[in-house]
């Protein structure tokens, strides 16, 4: 496979038939190929992620790196028709390449997101399948498991930083916010996320999605956490506490 340089800084490899696809890979991964996206390739160094991922995510370990491999899967009713294929609209619009490039851009801006390690798509006629590998952050737990702790301010500040960078998260919930052992906040899962031209409505939508998630996870305790997070968000945004 001949490698090209992607604007994200990754190496871009195009696969010949019959694979009919391409991949992006961090130079740290060396001369890697499609095997990166096959859990069987890692043997005992791969294990399923306990929660989320629609049974399509694994913790994997390579030579000098640890990551999370995720295959893109549909949810909801449409999954009954097509579990893992998407309509082809050009390479730049594949879910894997878009998420990889968004994460790379966010990392370059110093935002608290995992490093993208590799992304791929496999095209078949008018459809394609896709997968991504992102850096595994050691020693973290989801916000959903830490609501008894006074974390609303650092969580709010992380969201404000994301929004100030013009980034919209497609599913900001209590499991896509991770808390490190040092108290650092990380934001994950930017599938379908975008950057640029973030509207007030999109920001409010992110916040309300998180509120629903917190209440679903912890009921009244989740609502109390949300109210403190909301006030911290608006204070960090610079407009003071909002009603």
Where are the predicted features?
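Juxta-kinase regulatory segment immediately upstream of eukaryotic protein kinase catalytic domains
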Residues: 1-47
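Conserved ATP-binding subdomain of kinase catalytic cores across diverse folds
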Residues: 32-141, 160, 164-165
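Charged catalytic carboxylate motif
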Residues: 98, 154, 209
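Short, basic, helix/turn surface patches
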Residues: 138-151, 219
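Conserved alphaE helix
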Residues: 150-158
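Conserved catalytic-loop position in the HRD/HxD motif
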Residues: 166, 171, 189
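Hydrophobic residue at the +6 position relative to the catalytic HRD Asp in the kinase catalytic loop
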Residues: 172-179
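C-lobe/activation-segment region of protein kinase-like
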Residues: 180, 185-243
């Amino acid at each position: 496979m001949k490698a090209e340089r992607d604007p994200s800084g990754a190496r871009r490899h195009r696969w010949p038939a019959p694979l009919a696809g391409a991949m992006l890979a961090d130079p740290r991964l060396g001369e890697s190929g499609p095997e990166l996206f096959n859990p069987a390739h890692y043997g005992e160094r791969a294990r399923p992620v306990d929660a989320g991922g629609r049974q399509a995510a694994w913790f994997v370990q390579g030579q000098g790196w640890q990551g999370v491999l995720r295959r893109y899967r549909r949810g909801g009713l449409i999954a009954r028709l097509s579990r893992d294929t998407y309509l082809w609209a050009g390479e730049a619009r594949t879910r894997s390449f878009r998420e990889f490039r968004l994460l790379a851009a966010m990392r370059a801006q110093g935002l608290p997101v995992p490093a993208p390690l590799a992304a791929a798509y496999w095209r078949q006629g008018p459809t394609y399948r896709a997968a991504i590998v992102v850096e595994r952050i050691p020693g973290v737990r989801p916000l959903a498991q830490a609501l008894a702790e006074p974390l609303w301010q650092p969580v709010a500040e992380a969201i404000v930083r994301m929004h100030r960078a013009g980034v919209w998260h497609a599913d900001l919930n209590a499991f896509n916010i991770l808390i490190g052992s040092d108290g650092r906040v990380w934001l994950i899962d930017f599938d379908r996320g975008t950057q640029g031209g973030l509207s007030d409505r999109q920001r409010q939508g992110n916040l309300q999605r998180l509120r629903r998630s917190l209440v679903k996870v912890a009921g009244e305790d989740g609502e109390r956490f949300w109210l403190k997070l909301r006030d911290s968000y608006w204070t960090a945004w610079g407009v003071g506490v909002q009603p």
